[in-house]
């Protein structure tokens, strides 16, 4: 793969026509045609055959900025939700008085706080010249793009019929938010990227251990090192947050470190169970990715909250601590749910899913016929 530049005035290049889109209609997309187009050598970006690296670098930056844009968009949506919930009265009360509305507002606020925290970590990596932030950027992009979509959906739901019609702005927010889960790499692909990067190192380590077990007397060092790391992992003594935390945050740190250990051991079990077929076990990889995303978000939230406490004092950080508490609890619940679905028993359910999908493919759609309903 080779990267190169194309100018609109180059012979053989043509814009076929613009594309009419569901949302983001303020920007123009078009179909492009290349016919017998010759690219001069000085139009190359990097060396021949090195275009993939250029693409990855561009995508990393794009995922970072897209996550930032989604976070800003979610803040604006939450502002509109808060305003509407106070103004709209039902049953003698503003919508903001009802617990279901409060759950919507609080979840979105805590997720904004988490997304902002992840972006802070990412920005610091960029500022210090760290070029390898592809995993963190992918995590932030997936998290933020799904957050902004949920917020847009909740805004439309909160507004009721007004959310579905013009001239109210809510239907446009929904339309404009949808593309973010596709831009800069579809979220399904990014989840596989996150998970496969996560299993690569453990898989290599397990291969080394497997080779060492064939000649144990010659490889005592490797085996003992691996055994020690596994024991520490079981005890939750690896991947700790090496920062001093206020007492209000320590419970979150303890759960975080426990969950990191559980993710590591769960990854090992999956590799042992599936071996080379792990790359095709997309549902299991998707769960691993979601666990990793929630762990990255949790670590970012804890670190940011402690930084604010250090800077401003505990007395002025009650709202931020509440956001931290809420996000860590809900992220922990999602983590444990996904961890439970890594069990071999879930594979039976996954097999059923594959079977039903096969029936859909064979029937070219819904496949159940019922004589009573057809009459």
Outline where the language-model segments fall.
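Alpha-helix capping/hinge segments and adjacent helical runs
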Residues: 24, 131-229, 233, 319, ...
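Alpha-helical transition-metal enzyme core signature, strongest for iron centers
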Residues: 71, 75-78, 105-119, 144-155, ...
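A generic secondary-structure signal for well-formed alpha-helical elements
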Residues: 8, 78-89, 112-129, 148-151, ...
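A residue-level detector for conformationally permissive "hinge/kink" positions
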Residues: 15-18, 43, 54, 84, ...
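C-terminal amphipathic alpha-helical interaction region
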Residues: 221-375
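A broadly tuned preference for mixed-charge, low-complexity surface segments
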Residues: 15-31, 78-79, 85-86, 91-96, ...
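Glycine-rich cofactor-pocket loops
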Residues: 45-65, 78-110, 120-138, 162-167, ...
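FAD-binding core of flavoproteins
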Residues: 1-75, 90, 182, 186-269, ...
């Amino acid at each position: 793969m080779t990267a190169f530049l194309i100018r609109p005035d180059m012979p053989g290049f043509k814009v076929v026509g613009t594309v009419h889109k569901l949302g983001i209609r303020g920007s123009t997309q078009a179909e492009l045609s290349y016919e017998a187009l010759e690219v001069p050598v000085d139009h190359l970006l990097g060396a021949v055959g090195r275009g993939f690296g250029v693409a990855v670098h561009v995508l990393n930056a794009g995922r970072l900025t897209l996550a930032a844009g989604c976070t800003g968009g979610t803040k604006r949506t939450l502002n509109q939700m808060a305003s509407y919930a106070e103004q709209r009265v039902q049953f003698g009360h503003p919508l903001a008085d009802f617990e279901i509305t409060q759950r919507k507002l609080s979840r979105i606020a805590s997720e904004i706080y988490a997304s902002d925290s992840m972006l802070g970590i990412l920005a610091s990596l960029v500022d210090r010249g760290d070029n390898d932030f592809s995993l963190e950027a992918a995590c932030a992009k997936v998290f933020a793009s799904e957050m902004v979509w949920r917020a847009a959906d909740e805004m439309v739901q909160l507004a009721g019929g007004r959310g579905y019609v013009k001239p109210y702005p809510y239907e446009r927010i929904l339309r404009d938010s949808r593309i973010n889960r596709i831009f800069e790499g579809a979220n399904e692909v990014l989840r596989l990227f996150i998970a496969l990067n996560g299993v690569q190192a453990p898989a290599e380590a397990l291969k080394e251990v497997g080779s060492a077990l064939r000649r144990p007397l010659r490889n005592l060092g490797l085996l003992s090192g691996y055994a020690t790391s596994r024991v520490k992992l079981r005890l939750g003594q690896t991947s700790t947050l090496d920062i001093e935390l206020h007492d209000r945050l320590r419970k979150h740190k303890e759960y975080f470190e426990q969950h990191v250990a559980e993710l590591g051991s769960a990854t090992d079990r999956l590799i042992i169970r599936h071996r080379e077929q792990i790359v095709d076990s997309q549902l299991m990889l998707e769960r691993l990715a979601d666990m990793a995303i929630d762990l990255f978000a949790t670590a970012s939230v804890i670190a940011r909250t402690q930084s604010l406490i250090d800077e401003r004092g505990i007395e002025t950080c009650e709202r931020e601590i509440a956001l931290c508490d809420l996000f860590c609890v809900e992220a922990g619940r999602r983590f444990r749910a996904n961890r439970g679905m890594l069990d071999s028993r879930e594979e039976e359910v996954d097999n059923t899913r594959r079977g039903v999908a096969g029936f859909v493919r064979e029937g070219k759609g819904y496949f159940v016929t019922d004589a009573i309903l057809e009459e």
